[in-house]
Curated annotation (Swiss-Prot):
Compartments reported by the entry: Spore coat; Cytoplasm
Leader sequence segment: none
Gene Ontology molecular functions: structural constituent of ascospore wall
Taxonomy of the source species: Eukaryota, Fungi, Dikarya, Ascomycota, Taphrinomycotina
Biased amino acid composition, Acidic residues: 68-79
Positions of region (Disordered): 33-103, 163-182
Gene: isp3
Function: Forms fibrillar structures on the spore surface that contribute to spore wall integrity.
Protein name per its UniProtKB record: Spore wall structural constituent isp3
Length: 182
């Protein structure tokens, strides 16, 4: 399963640990209004995964990264099952995607980061290859998965490239001396 665009990221086990770390490191460098984005920074380790809260929950969702580090008591299975139909009837794709594919709203760490980045776009989650900028030196792209491999190019590639040095301003041309008056 490919990454899809940032808004509709789904689990892709073909991403290796290094690729995941690159994405997270890039995310952690994002700044808001010139200040480090501490609010959304997360540790960059991936293994071992956090222990499941409930074994039943783990078997239900069938993937490895459904657990949030947040202890949200309102996000239990019962309340989520009640919310899910109403959410999807209203056709809120982010809500439905997170509840159906991430263990009842529990996004894995990478998905939560990419969803956050996607929120800085134009709000159209099915746009592809659209550049959008988070305040700071990095421009992120919504990219579509490669049609052959199904894997989306690393969205954080720009983060690995040092910011281009500012081009020095061209010196103003020397004023031509005025011709002597006749």
């Amino acid at each position: 399963m490919g990454l899809g665009n940032l808004c509709s990221y789904k689990q892709d086990d073909s991403l290796d640990i290094l690729q995941k770390k690159v994405l997270i490191d890039a995310f952690n460098k994002v700044t808001i209004d010139g200040k480090p984005n501490v609010q959304h920074q997360q540790p960059t380790y991936w293994y071992p995964p956090p222990p499941p809260r409930h074994h039943k929950e783990h078997k239900k969702s069938h993937h490895h990264w459904e657990y949030s580090s947040d202890d949200d008591s309102s996000d239990d299975e019962e309340s989520c099952e009640k919310k899910k139909p109403k959410c999807c009837e209203k056709k809120k794709p982010k809500c439905c995607e997170s509840e159906q594919n991430n263990g009842c709203g529990r996004r894995n760490q990478l998905a939560r980061r990419l969803a956050f980045l996607g929120s800085f776009g134009d709000g159209d989650c099915d746009g592809c290859n659209e550049a959008f900028t988070v305040t700071g030196p990095i421009t992120y792209f919504r990219t579509c998965p490669d049609p052959l491999t199904g894997i989306t190019p690393a969205v954080a590639a720009a983060a690995a490239t040092p910011a281009a040095a500012a081009t020095p301003a061209t010196p103003a041309a020397a004023a031509t001396p005025a011709a002597p008056a006749a």
